[in-house]
């Protein structure tokens, strides 16, 4: 994570990045089997593009360890910002299967579809709550105000 954060902030000038731990979320399913994945996550913007850096912090089977084993560090997924049910229907109709799913602590569902054969990665769908949308807006505002140097890495609590 540290190497990726350095690259994105220093070289690309994306950021600042807001870093937080994601504990094991309820109801996680990986390829049809229950799992318990914990993550360290960093969100930052480059222009209007939201960049999510992920590091799994435990040794459970997941789409994250699957991709590391397959191709090492790098691109993992893109998230479509469309209504969750619409996305599930669209991707399922094209034959893509849910590889990983669960529920956020606030109740929003998420799913990562296996689109490896189509685009080399996964496609994520998520129900975004008003609180999550507001957090993303504050992150984007921080990006627009950022000087590209000071405090490139911040705690999620800094958004409050």
What are these regions (language model features)?
Residues 20-22:
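Generic detection of short hydrophobic beta-strand segments and adjacent strand-loop junctions
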Residues 24-30:
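Short, charge-patterned binding micro-sites
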Residues 28, 110-111:
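Short Asp/Glu-rich motifs
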Residues 105-109:
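Short acidic/glycine-enriched loop/turn segments that link adjacent beta-strands
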